[in-house]
Amino acid sequence: MINSNIRLYILGFLAFFASLIQNIYTPIIPRLYDDFQVPLFWINATVGGFIFIVAVMQIVLGRSIDSRDSKKVLLTGLGIVIISSFICAVTHNFILFAISRLFQAIGCGIIPLVTLTLLAKLSTDNGRAQAMANYQIFLSCAPALAPILGSTLGARWDYIGIFSFLLVISIVLFLIIFFY
């Protein structure tokens, strides 16, 4: 059985990871232009499309997430991220890359909703404020760290390295959630 503090940190890391997924590949957008040989407009459209889908997921699932099995929904979201990260890492076809990236946004949109629900369920009235504060800390670190991590991985291994990294982390998180 996992200690409740460890669970809270896992949930915080899930929030961090969801935000990381959104922001990690922006530093290599010019390289994607070279790799895929498509107009920069279409590469930028994957960024805007990703954000739009995450927002839609929040609206669509936001009202009903409390009535669903949180663990199954979270595993579904992580499963979508795993599959889409794998496809993004191995494809050399931009259309497949873009579609997979947009599916990745569906999984990414699920994660923070379930995380907040579980944080509320796992924390007591007295600890809820601290749990939410820690959640916000994790959440706000990702936009600062994602471009650094993305440019480091991208400089060495291009987009393949970035999406392979996301694949490995999402598999680890899936296994942790599955077994806890």
Q: What does each of the following model-derived ranges do?
A:
Residues 134-178:
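Helix-loop-helix hairpin linking two adjacent transmembrane segments in secondary transporters
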Residues 56-92:
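Conserved MFS/SLC helix-loop-helix module at the cytosolic interface between two early adjacent transmembrane helices
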Residues 84, 95-103:
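Paired small-residue
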